[in-house]
Regions:
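Residue-level detector of buried hydrophobic side-chain packing
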Residues: 23, 97, 140, 178, ...
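Lectin-like carbohydrate-binding module/patch detector with strong preference for beta-trefoil
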Residues: 394-552
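Extracellular structured ligand-interaction cores
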Residues: 18-20, 56-58, 74-76, 92-94, ...
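Extracellular/periplasmic catalytic domains that process cell-envelope and extracellular macromolecules
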Residues: 13-17, 52-54, 68-73, 87-91, ...
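Internal "kinase-insert"/substrate-recognition segments embedded within catalytic cores
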Residues: 96-104, 113-125, 142-148, 157-262, ...
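Metal-dependent nuclease catalytic cores in nucleic-acid-processing enzymes
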Residues: 131-145, 322-323, 335, 340
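Middle-to-C-terminal accessory/interaction subdomains
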Residues: 10-11, 18-19, 29-33, 222-270, ...
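Conserved NTP-binding catalytic cores of kinases and kinase-like/nucleotidyltransferase enzymes
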Residues: 1-130, 135-138
């Protein structure tokens, strides 16, 4: 691995290093770049005729960063339009830059300057928050999977921010600078360049019918796709057992779990798209089963964390279908979801890593003039919280470590009072009040709840006291049956609650992240209401219209 190049790329792609890229070229040539239509047509996934766009020569490209590199201009740089479907745009096109496409003399200077000859600039037209791509790759990094480095770039052509004055263009000149899957990427993520690399676009899969359409990347040691052909035939003949011999299925299980958490509907498992696959061995001319170890590479994360979509273990991809349909492998995926729920999406990571990461991006984006940054940040943060909650609903409810139970509307958490009690009546013993409050900055066990199977439902216990939640028949002044915690006594199933996922109904593998908590005893659900305790704190009571809740 070229350590000097990797260090330069680390500096180049540092999240707080904003690049300025000034492209100079004849206006007619620029118009040809931005307005070019893809060979084969828009959204044609059956194209086998090579590159969809034409490389053109920029007179010069000047590159600098707020921290790295120093302002440097290079002549005769290759520039090509990118994206032939969802992100296609003539007003603000995605771009590939190759600093040595037309000049070998640029190879050494650009390698020393930034570590690579290639840049990929995404227009983010499908993610106007400009947050999701960089957040998604950060999450894959935290998961220990292949990931792209990335940051932001302000890009001008002949002194004008790209897209300025063009109808319908959001945030002219602002681009997401994502590390492409090229030699330095493969070196960093796999430690060598001796394998073969392929790209899967929409509908491409490890099946014979799609073999002709799967593209082989130029860094591959061989370009005849012999290893890919062998793998496809081997899976066709031997199913899951065959797949386990030519794919790193443990790595795939991790990819599968992360696509679940990111709602990556445009990735491999849900749409057979936006995926590279690398044969992580020294490639040979006539491969057999011992010469193949394919690993997946995630790509195209701009449509992750969309609020209208669900967290789902889908089976559009053959590997996903084989894995989900097998009881043992399915259990492995669920176990991986549990593991990532605690590590990548856990409270500590969210507070110490993801919150400052998002805050930093938000500050930069506001400085660029990107609209509605606070609103966009709020929406993405909510998706991160719901991802953790979906991890509980799919991977198993909170155990002895406990978790917050929070209301979707207020984001307040279920709290077991230490000081206020519900008086005993002739029908009911007393108990500690259950209220809702804002989550404190520091973890307090009175806000954490532990679940365990009990009778027809779940016991819901306060981590602080160990006492279970009870559905009482005692009513408040406003007529609502109350909840309380008290010593264990499951008479009349008062301690049993059902946790029911909210939407999609009847889908064992899809989750919104929300749920309702309903008493088996009364059939009423937990509602974060306004009924006051004696000291004016808002109660969580029982109601026929329960609150929509989530775990965090």
């Amino acid at each position: 691995m070229g350590s000097q190049e990797q260090r330069a790329l680390d500096s180049l792609y540092a999240i707080d290093n904003v690049l300025t890229i000034d492209i100079t070229m004849p206006p007619t040539d620029w118009d040809a770049v931005r307005t070019e239509q893809p060979a084969g047509g828009v959204c044609n996934f059956e194209w086998t005729g090579g590159s969809r766009y034409t490389w053109r020569e920029a007179t010069s490209v000047e590159l600098s960063g707020t921290k790295f590199p120093v302002r440097t201009a290079l002549p005769r740089v290759g520039i090509k339009k990118k994206s032939f479907c969802g992100s296609i745009s003539s007003g603000k096109p995605c771009l590939h830059l190759d600093f040595a496409k037309f000049s070998d003399a640029n190879k050494d200077p650009v390698r020393k300057l930034i570590g690579s000859r290639y840049l990929t600039l995404n227009n983010s037209v499908q993610d106007l928050s400009y947050l999701r791509q960089l957040l998604g790759y950060k999450l894959f990094e935290l998961a220990g999977l292949p990931f792209s480095r990335g940051n932001y770039a302000q890009v001008r052509v002949n002194g004008v921010p790209i897209g300025q004055g063009e109808a319908g263009v959001d945030s002219p000149g602002v681009f997401v600078n994502v590390e492409p899957v090229m030699p330095r990427y493969v070196e960093r993520n796999f430690g060598h360049l001796n394998g073969n690399l392929y790209e899967l676009e929409h509908e491409d899969d490890f099946i014979a019918e799609r073999f002709p359409f799967i593209g082989v990347e130029s860094l591959s040691k061989f370009d005849d796709k012999a290893d890919l052909r062998f793998a496809i035939d081997h899976i066709g003949a031997h199913g899951l057992a065959g797949a386990s011999e030519v794919f790193d299925l443990d790595q795939f299980v991790k990819i599968y779990a992360m696509e679940f958490f990111l709602k990556h509907w445009d990735g491999y498992s849900r749409n057979t798209n936006n995926t590279y696959v690398y044969n992580d061995v020294d490639a040979v001319a006539q491969p057999g089963v011992d010469d193949i170890d394919f690993k997946l590479i995630p790509w195209g994360l701009d449509q992750t964390f969309q609020p209208a979509r669900h967290f789902r273990l889908d089976t559009a991809g053959l590997l996903a279908r084989l894995v989900r349909d097998d009881a043992g492998r399915r259990a492995q995926v669920v176990g991986q979801i549990r593991a990532y729920r605690e590590s990548v999406f856990g409270f500590q990571t969210q507070q110490e890593v993801l919150k400052p990461f998002l805050d930093g991006m938000g500050t930069l984006l506001a400085g660029f003039g990107v609209p509605d940054v606070p609103t966009q940040l709020t929406a993405v943060r909510k998706q991160l919280r719901l991802a953790a909650s979906a991890g509980y609903l799919c991977g198993g409810l909170p155990g002895s470590a406990g978790a917050y139970v929070r209301d979707d509307v207020t984001n307040e958490c279920l709290h077991a009072s230490r000081s206020e009690v519900i008086p005993a009546t002739a029908e009911e013993p007393g108990g500690a009040e259950v209220v809702h409050r804002l989550r404190p900055a520091n973890v307090d066990d009175t806000d954490l709840w532990c679940f365990a199977p009990l009778g027809a439902g779940q016991s819901v216990g306060s981590k602080a006291s160990g006492q279970p939640l009870h559905a009482t028949t005692t009513t408040s002044g406003q007529g609502h049956p109350l909840l309380c915690t008290r010593a264990a006594d499951n008479a009349a199933q008062a301690e049993e609650f059902s946790v029911t996922p909210v939407d999609p109904v009847g889908d064992d593998f899809g989750f919104s992240g929300w749920f309702t908590l309903t008493s088996i005893r009364t059939g009423l659900g937990a509602a974060f209401g306004t009924d006051p305790t004696a000291t004016g704190k808002p109660r969580v009571h029982q109601d026929a219209n329960p609150s929509k809740l989530y775990f965090s």
